[in-house]
Structures are given as structure tokens and as C-alpha cells.
């Protein structure tokens, strides 16, 4: 989910965040204030003190200023006969802060304790589990699988958000929540994937819609969409790692209302070369393909079978009817005692069939 800012305007002075250096003090017009704020944010300063000596609309300024990189800011102000003294305090977005620390090690001392823990934990994970000899695709898959298995979607936080309840606890929106608590909403998943992929040498970007967040990953010279959050939820549902939202194109991804990017200037994702199902022969173009793929997988010993179904919204599939052939499967003389399935729909292109054998 998107970051949420809280704004406080009070008539007394207090410092709510520890400044990493003595707060800068400047006398500012609107333009000078904007420059001072941009410099403070670029330097990850904890605080900035500004004296306004020009008459301008502060509310309009705040509405228009781009606080990119800041997860929370607070403004405390007091007006004298001559000017307005403003003290700005900042806390920084997890990905912004860690990116700065990776670009310049001196910024590590400016990370919050939790951000420092995330960076340390991710470095240890990459060192232990992701050797340099792996391809970027293999690194991405390993990270995807790890997060799908070890992180669960935070339903309670999501329900609160949908109900308009805004909590002071932003942990579920962070990589810290995903990696240390094992629960997160989409932003936490995307942040964790970003840190792990970046430390593994895989270029990626966080993509935001109005209600969701995921990653755009560069593999070779092409880009693909990766939504670990939705694959993790399907993994919990089916009991096996799912790849429904693993390396999709723009066309495939943006069919879903939640996947309408608001980011400007994203590179196009137009290759199916890294789609898991397409590369493994698990792509069905019609019902005959569905039967062929499931039968072959069953005979090979698979009991939890997922496949991509093209154009499933166009054709009149009745999966309760169309999967009756499963009862006739007898791999190694074993019979199907029961089976369950998760069918394709408006928000997924994969069919998952789980077989229980006698």
C-alpha cells in the first residue's frame, strides 16, 4: 500500500525525532524553503529549522511540495512579530533510506534501528543463499519462493485500511514486518523483495497503484512484473508455491484493477520469456491441453498441479464439469480419491488442481 503522511501543526516547539546532525537553520522565501527541504531530504537530515521572512501560503506550499523519500514529517511552528519559526522533523521511507546507504556507506549511520536490521538481515540472507553464479532469473525465483513460504498477508491490517482505520503502527507496510514478523501487506512484501533483489545484483523498481505495490524486475535486457504478495496469498491457499503473478507483461498485469501503475516513466514489460508456466510447458490453450498437462503431471507423480489457461474468460469453461476426467487418472495403479481446484477468474490466469490419491 502507499505511504501515509501525518501532518501536525502546533504552536509550541518540540523535537520528535532524533536529528543526526544539528538542525540546519535558514531564512526562507517559498523558493528557498523548497530548496532547503530538498537538501535536507537528500542528506537524510533528521530536522530542519526555517525562519519564514516572506509572505507566502504555507498550506499551499505543503500541498504542492514533493516529499518523496519521506515516510512521515511533522511541522512545529511559532510566529513572532517579525517572522515564523518552523521546525521540520523527518522520518524516512525504508527503501529510500536503504538505497541511500547502499549508494554511500556513510548514510548507514542515519538508518533507523529497524532499517539497519533489515539491511543486515538481507545481507546475511544473500551471502548464505544466493551465490553469484546464479542467473538473475534464478535469484529472483529463489527470493520469490522464500517470501511466499515465509511471509503471510496481514489480513487484519488490510481490513482496517479498507475500513478507513489508520494505525500508527506502520510495521506491516515495511520489509521489517515481512522479514522479522512474518506478516505484511503488499508494500512490506515489495520492500523486502526490493532489498533482497538489489543486494543480489538484480535491478528492480517498486511499482505503486492507488491501492497496491509490487516490483518490476529487469532480467537480461527485458522487464517483468513480479507480485509476491498475490503469489504468497495463493501459496497459502493451495499449499504449494504459486507463480500466477511471476514475470508478467504489462498487458497481462494491467488487466487487474489493482495493477494500474501511477509511477511515471516505467520501462515497458513486454516479454513472456521468463514466465514460469510458459517455460515449463504448463500453458494450456484449450480444454484438451488442460487434460493433457494434468494427466502427464499426475503420471509423473505431481499431486499439486498448476497451469496457465489462455483466454479462460472468453470460453465457456465449467471447471466442475470439465475436470471430470481427473477421476479416470490411475498413475501407478493408484486412484483419485478426491480432488479440489482453484479455478481461473478475473484476477488470476492459472488453474490449480490438488489430487488426493487412494
Model-identified regions with their sequence ranges:
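Linear, non-domain "peripheral" regions
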Residues: 5, 22, 26-125, 295-306, ...
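Active-site beta-strand termini and strand-to-loop segments that position acidic
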Residues: 217-220, 356-358
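Eukaryotic intrinsically disordered, low-complexity regions
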Residues: 28, 170, 207, 218-226, ...
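Bacterial N-terminal signal peptides that target proteins for export
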Residues: 1-9
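Bacterial N-terminal signal peptides
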Residues: 10-21
Amino acid at each position: 500500500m502507499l505511504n501515509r503522511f501525518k501532518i501536525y501543526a502546533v504552536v509550541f516547539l518540540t523535537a520528535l525525532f532524533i536529528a543526526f546532525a544539528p538542525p540546519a537553520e535558514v531564512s526562507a522565501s517559498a523558493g528557498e524553503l523548497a530548496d532547503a527541504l530538498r537538501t535536507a531530504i537528500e542528506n537524510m537530515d533528521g530536522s530542519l529549522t526555517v525562519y519564514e521572512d516572506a509572505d507566502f501560503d504555507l498550506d499551499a506550499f505543503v500541498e504542492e511540495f514533493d516529499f518523496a523519500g519521506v515516510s512521515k514529517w511533522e511541522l512545529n511552528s511559532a510566529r513572532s512579530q517579525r517572522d515564523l519559526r518552523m521546525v521540520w522533523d523527518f522520518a524516512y521511507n525504508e527503501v529510500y533510506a536503504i538505497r541511500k546507504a547502499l549508494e554511500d556507506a556513510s548514510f548507514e549511520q542515519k538508518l533507523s534501528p529497524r532499517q539497519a536490521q533489515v539491511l543486515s538481515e538481507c545481507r546475511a540472507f544473500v551471502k548464505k543463499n544466493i551465490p553469484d553464479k546464479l542467473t538473475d532469473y534464478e535469484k529472483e525465483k529463489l527470493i520469490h519462493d522464500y517470501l511466499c513460504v515465509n511471509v503471510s498477508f496481514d489480513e487484519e491490517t488490510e481490513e482496517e485500511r479498507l475500513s478507513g482505520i489508520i494505525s500508527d503502527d506502520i510495521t506491516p507496510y515495511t520489509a521489517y514486518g515481512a522479514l522479522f514478523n512474518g506478516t505484511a501487506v503488499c508494500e512490506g512484501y515489495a520492500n523486502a523483495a526490493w532489498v533482497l533483489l538489489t543486494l543480489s545484483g538484480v535491478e528492480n523498481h517498486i511499482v505503486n497503484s492507488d491501492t497496491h505495490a509490487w516490483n518490476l524486475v529487469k532480467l537480461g535486457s527485458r522487464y517483468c512484473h513480479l507480485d509476491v504478495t498475490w503469489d504468497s496469498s495463493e501459496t497459502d491457499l493451495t499449499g504449494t508455491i504459486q507463480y500466477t503473478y511471476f514475470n508478467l507483461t504489462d498487458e497481462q498485469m494491467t488487466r487487474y484493477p489493482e495493477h494500474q501503475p501511477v509511477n511515471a516513466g516505467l520501462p515497458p514489460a513486454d516479454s513472456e520469456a521468463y514466465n514460469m508456466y510458459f517455460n515449463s510447458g504448463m500453458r494450456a490453450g484449450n480444454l484438451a491441453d488442460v487434460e493433457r498437462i494434468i494427466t502427464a503431471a499426475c503420471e509423473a507423480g505431481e499431486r499439486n498441479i498448476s497451469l496457465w489457461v489462455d483466454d479462460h474468460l472468453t470460453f465457456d469453461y465449467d471447471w466442475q464439469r470439465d475436470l471430470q476426467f481427473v477421476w479416470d487418472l490411475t498413475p501407478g495403479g493408484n486412484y483419485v480419491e478426491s480432488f479440489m481446484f482453484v479455478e481461473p477468474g478475473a484476477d488470476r490466469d492459472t488453474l490449480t488442481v490438488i489430487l488426493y490419491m487412494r
